[in-house]
Amino acid sequence: MEPFFRRVFSVAKRVLRQLQHDKRFIGLSLMVPVAIIYVLYVFFDSLNNPLLNANAYVFPFGAYIVHFLTFVLTAIVLVRERVTETLTRMMVNGYQQLEIILGYLIAYSTLATGQSLLVLVEITWLFKLDYSFATLASIYLVMWLLAVISMALAIFVSNFANNEGQVFPFIPLVTLPGMFLSGMVISIEVLPEWAQVLSRFTPVYYATEVLHALTSGGNLWDESAALLSLPAYGFVVLVLASFTLRDND
């Protein structure tokens, strides 16, 4: 097992070194969600509706923004790695699919850590939310798990694209169901049965279930099934990604 982990961390170190030189990618990953969250604040503030409980929406929307941007940026970067034949060279040098995928996931998870923290702090500050530290830490955990799953989805989807242009059709296919079928906008119960079934195939549904419980005064284990579904979902996607990863055609 030691050579396996050594190769995984070797991939992670290479990707981290590459990220250090890609200031544009880091800037987009960190600043774009900050800007979108501010627009979200302006939107809710402009509604000026005392009957609207913004607290029930802002964290699910924040988590969705992290999900969307993480998926898009990671997928594009990974396809670029394929175009430049970086993946091909790693496979030629003896790296296995799972080692490559875990290495990329570890490296990009460091960025997801900062991104999720920024979104959490900004939402709490702008909307003047007064949750306990334990609740905020739980919200952060859910957002971070969703970001990691988004990266796993991006790795999986990038396996079916040979250039950046081929990624774009996957963006609405993967991300839009999470907005409309997760309970973030309207309650799941009012959707048709087929839509309720379909909602279980998007990770945003499980994240939203847990976030709603947390912002309503509950704790992580009030929605334990949804919480445990997040790492399970990520595991399944990683397995699929490892089986479909290939070198450049």
Q: Locations of the language-model features?
A:
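Transmembrane helix-boundary elements of multi-pass transport/secretion proteins
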Residues: 3-87, 98-116, 127-136, 166-169, ...
